[in-house]
Amino acid sequence: MKPMILFSVWLAATSTAIAQPTKTVGRTIPLPATGSVTLETHNGSIDVQTWDRAEIEIHAGIQAAGTWSDDVRRFDQTTVDIQSTADSVWIKSRYPTFTTWTWFGSNARIDYKITAPKTARWTIYDHNASVDVRGVQAAITIETHNGRVHLSDVAGPLRVGAHNGSVTGDLASFRGAEFTSHLGSLDLTLPSTAAFHLQADSRRGSVQSDFPLAIRMLGRRHTTVDGEVNGGGPSLRFHSHAGKLRLQSKN
């Protein structure tokens, strides 16, 4: 019986010892409905939701990449920098700068959950992170590298640049958009009554649309589209190298 008890205690202690260190950062800051939010991060996730309050709630969960001493050291040096003015908030993930002792190990992961006024403007820069934005009714700018972007129930002007990533969007209405993609894909769902002017240029890629459009092939690897949908309206521009554009309609 004793060996079994000792083994159980040792196993429990080992499980506790190998848990990856975590910490959280949380703040609530006044932000008017016409304010702006800028977020810059690397390695993690961003979850943006909206409400009608004149404030922004920020929650960041930080987790070490592993349990090795170099991973833990990097985790200890990782912080979230939050600055604000009367109508703007800046959020930036801060990782340890390069020194001889930070050569080994991996940076910590930071997962953001943020709720802000639905009409606040957003600018997001991310590398190797997933981005989910829901309910924003204002301008959104996103630059992503090696990431995934999903937009749902958004209704503001959009500007998205993606390198080696995918972008999906379900738009409540359309007020203009520009997408630039390299080795990525864009799958966009719009109301069937949406009126817009599509300008698409895809090299070594493809363009597919539920909306009636004349798709022109300039050679085997160059696809262009320039046409109006439902009488025309705000511009939808898509520029891609080795990327795919898919436009779907919804009732």
Q: Predicted regions span which residues?
A:
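Intrinsically disordered, low-complexity terminal regions
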Residues: M1-N251
